[in-house]
Amino acid sequence: MSEMEVEKPDLTLYNTMTQLKEVYKPMNPGKIGIYVCGITAYDYSHIGHARAAVSFDLLYRYLRHLGYQVTYVRNFTDVDDKAKNCGEKPLDLSNRFCEEYLLDMAALQCLLPTHQPRVSDHMEQIIKMIEKIIENGCGYAVGGDVFFSVDKSPSYGQLSGQRLDHTQAGKRVAVDSRKRNPADFALRKAAKSGEPSWESPWGHGRPGWHIEFDIHGGGADLKFPHHENEIAQTCAACEDSGVNYWLHNGHVTNNNVKMGKSLNNFFTIRQIAANYHPLALRHFLMSAQYRSPLNYSVSQLESSSDALYSLSPYREEMSGDVGKTQQSAEAKEMIKKVKNALKFINVSISKLKKMQKKQRMSLVVSLVEVEKAVREVLDVLGLLTTLSYGELLKDMKQKALTRAGMGEEEVLQRIEERNMARKSKDFRRSDRIRELLAFKGIFLEDVPGDTVWRPSTPLTKPKSGLGLGMTAIVFAIVFTFLGFFFYSR
């Protein structure tokens, strides 16, 4: 058996259905299908939507990196009653915000899925599936609406842990007296004024739930009733849900309350990207174990931005120093561990954590191999920008100035004032200027013959040098990556 075969373990995923970490076994060897619930397109997407997109983009990237042929489907729900309140033709509104969402995903460096179906394009298939559900005795039509009978689904509630006798139908909306069971849900809704509708055997109407792979993913809030309903209706039509593994990412919270449009406590991707580079937002969204809640925090965004900025000059330094030194045994060991962590995800976390403590090792040598390893990690994590690093740094510095409420001329003026204070040995004033700028997230660094500035986390005392060391950054992002697959609740 080759060394590669010895090192490569089974891929392990946490399955929401069983609440266990399970060895992943594809339906078809070498091929994987992933279905992820996308947005309801009627407004700009917030960072809660972004977390789901980034989480499953990470999975998609990693599976492709392992060599799997991946079919990745992420849908658009472009048929919804929310659109009618926006003063625009519903499908025009949906089309516009589908395109805006794709621009947001490009900014976050989320790869395009292989398929992006829209509900409105698949009405014929949806109608056929509803007919099959009714034919199998699991659905019934009432006055143009079609409902699913949850009493016909013995396993209803298994995914979310909800017991049918404990579900609180009518908690948010009045119970429809036409239902045989208050928990029955709509497969199709009769047409209403101002909403798009399509002809069907039950009259004009639209789907109540989009009708759907080997892996099915989405936000934790979709477990019930959305994904429960998907399972029930698919089993009713096809005798099997067709899904073996259910993955759910945690909520993004604001002051520990789930971020959402109904509470108006959300920030859109566009709002954050106006002040931070989108890759800093991506880094932030991967900073917690993917199934855990992630609380929105300006300080955490600042830290992610700082880490992203710090990485760039180190990579430039590595590229510039290629071949100048011999590779140390310690550097070789670090490279090996990083590569193994990326390629074979079940590598021992405890061993990596022990290595993380060795951050004082000299800046890595034999830099061709190190840069290759780092680029490999960053590419899978979606943090390898297509911009030149000069362009990236320029963009991040401009956003730092925006957050600080300053122009670059003002910063340069403060640097000149500090230089004059140092020449006159007024070190108290010199330190005060540096401190005031640091308070605004502007860190001054003295280099031979000059003083330069860079973005930094405000209100924290900057460390010497360029902030996070390369080793620390590599291990930080590897731990983020491992967390997607490993950690349970």
From Swiss-Prot:
<dbReference type="InterPro" id="IPR032678">
    <property type="entry name" value="tRNA-synt_1_cat_dom"/>
</dbReference>
<dbReference type="InterPro" id="IPR014729">
    <property type="entry name" value="Rossmann-like_a/b/a_fold"/>
</dbReference>
<keyword id="KW-0030">Aminoacyl-tRNA synthetase</keyword>
<keyword id="KW-0862">Zinc</keyword>
<keyword id="KW-0479">Metal-binding</keyword>
<dbReference type="GO" id="GO:0004817">
    <property type="term" value="F:cysteine-tRNA ligase activity"/>
</dbReference>
<feature type="short sequence motif" description="'KMSKS' region">
    <location>
        <begin position="258"/>
        <end position="262"/>
    </location>
</feature>
<feature type="binding site">
    <location>
        <position position="37"/>
    </location>
    <ligand>
        <name>Zn(2+)</name>
    </ligand>
</feature>
<keyword id="KW-0067">ATP-binding</keyword>
<feature type="binding site">
    <location>
        <position position="226"/>
    </location>
    <ligand>
        <name>Zn(2+)</name>
    </ligand>
</feature>
<keyword id="KW-0547">Nucleotide-binding</keyword>
<dbReference type="GO" id="GO:0006423">
    <property type="term" value="P:cysteinyl-tRNA aminoacylation"/>
</dbReference>
<dbReference type="Pfam" id="PF01406">
    <property type="entry name" value="tRNA-synt_1e"/>
</dbReference>
<dbReference type="GO" id="GO:0005524">
    <property type="term" value="F:ATP binding"/>
</dbReference>
<dbReference type="InterPro" id="IPR015803">
    <property type="entry name" value="Cys-tRNA-ligase"/>
</dbReference>
<feature type="binding site">
    <location>
        <position position="261"/>
    </location>
    <ligand>
        <name>ATP</name>
    </ligand>
</feature>
<dbReference type="GO" id="GO:0046872">
    <property type="term" value="F:metal ion binding"/>
</dbReference>
<keyword id="KW-0963">Cytoplasm</keyword>
<dbReference type="GO" id="GO:0005829">
    <property type="term" value="C:cytosol"/>
</dbReference>
<dbReference type="InterPro" id="IPR009080">
    <property type="entry name" value="tRNAsynth_Ia_anticodon-bd"/>
</dbReference>
<feature type="short sequence motif" description="'HIGH' region">
    <location>
        <begin position="39"/>
        <end position="49"/>
    </location>
</feature>
<dbReference type="InterPro" id="IPR024909">
    <property type="entry name" value="Cys-tRNA/MSH_ligase"/>
</dbReference>
<protein>
    <recommendedName>
        <fullName>Cysteine--tRNA ligase 1, cytoplasmic</fullName>
        <ecNumber>6.1.1.16</ecNumber>
    </recommendedName>
</protein>
<keyword id="KW-0648">Protein biosynthesis</keyword>
<keyword id="KW-0436">Ligase</keyword>
<comment type="similarity">
    <text>Belongs to the class-I aminoacyl-tRNA synthetase family.</text>
</comment>
<feature type="binding site">
    <location>
        <position position="230"/>
    </location>
    <ligand>
        <name>Zn(2+)</name>
    </ligand>
</feature>
